[in-house]
Amino acid sequence: MESKVVENRLKEAKLIAVIRSKDKQEACQQIESLLDKGIRAVEVTYTTPGASDIIESFRNREDILIGAGTVISAQQAGEAAKAGAQFIVSPGFSADLAEHLSFVKTHYIPGVLTPSEIMEALTFGFTTLKLFPSGVFGIPFMKNLAGPFPQVTFIPTGGIHPSEVPDWLRAGAGAVGVGSQLGSCSKEDLQAVFQV
């Protein structure tokens, strides 16, 4: 899937469910439950046992954009791409990982936090960036970074409650990553997110 298509689908999804589990079966059940609630983008972290198998089991579903998260090595990136990940996310920026992923036809979203990291990511041509950990710094932090970097689409992730997602989207986020707190949300709770 082409990068522009992936970026557009992530923006349409608005919320990216970040799956971090101790068990492969539990992770698959979480994903199915989230799909029933209307979630359309899922990032399976590579701290989850069997992450590649989980991605592979959802790769042909048309109702989901499935990606790999917490990818910190070229080996993990290769495994994720082979499993069928439609996007790959790392918690930070690594020039080595960025260079490796330039040869893989999977959309890459590097993580950043500082202006220096953003500038380095831009030199590699990345304009959609995971802002991590966003919940600690809040919306004003993202807005301050957007001032000098208007060409960047931020995907804030880390410590964000689902009820806060609409505020992040209104502040300019392209999409928002949310983790474990999604499990307690009902389909109705998530409608507020999808309406923004």
Curated annotation (Swiss-Prot):
Matching Gene3D superfamilies: Aldolase class I
Pathway entry: Carbohydrate acid metabolism; 2-dehydro-3-deoxy-D-gluconate degradation; D-glyceraldehyde 3-phosphate and pyruvate from 2-dehydro-3-deoxy-D-gluconate: step 2/2
Binding site for pyruvate: T70, K130
EC number: 4.1.2.14
Reaction(s) catalysed (UniProt annotation): 2-dehydro-3-deoxy-6-phospho-D-gluconate = D-glyceraldehyde 3-phosphate + pyruvate
Localization per Swiss-Prot or TrEMBL: Cytoplasm
GO cellular component: cytoplasm
Record key words, sorted: Carbohydrate metabolism, Cytoplasm, Lyase, Schiff base
Principal subcellular localization: cytoplasm
Gene induction: Induced by galacturonate and negatively regulated by the KdgR repressor. Is subject to catabolite repression by glucose involving the ccpA gene.
Cytoplasm listed as a keyword: yes
Biological process annotations from GO: D-galactonate catabolic process
Site keyed Plays a major role in determining the stereoselectivity: positions: T157
MF annotations from Gene Ontology: (R,S)-4-hydroxy-2-oxoglutarate aldolase activity; 2-dehydro-3-deoxy-6-phosphogalactonate aldolase activity; 2-dehydro-3-deoxy-phosphogluconate aldolase activity
Pfam family, one: Aldolase
Active site (UniProt): E43 (proton acceptor), K130 (schiff-base intermediate with substrate)
Keyword Methyltransferase: no
PROSITE patterns per the UniProt record, alphabetical: ALDOLASE_KDPG_KHG_2 (PS00160)
Listed PANTHER family: 2-DEHYDRO-3-DEOXY-6-PHOSPHOGALACTONATE ALDOLASE-RELATED, 2-KETO-3-DEOXY-6-PHOSPHOGLUCONATE ALDOLASE
Quaternary structure annotation from Swiss-Prot or TrEMBL: Homotrimer.
NCBIfam families: eda (TIGR01182)
Function: Catalyzes the reversible, stereospecific retro-aldol cleavage of 2-keto-3-deoxy-6-phosphogluconate (KDPG) to pyruvate and D-glyceraldehyde-3-phosphate.
Family, as annotated: Belongs to the KHG/KDPG aldolase family.
Name assigned to this protein: 2-dehydro-3-deoxy-phosphogluconate aldolase
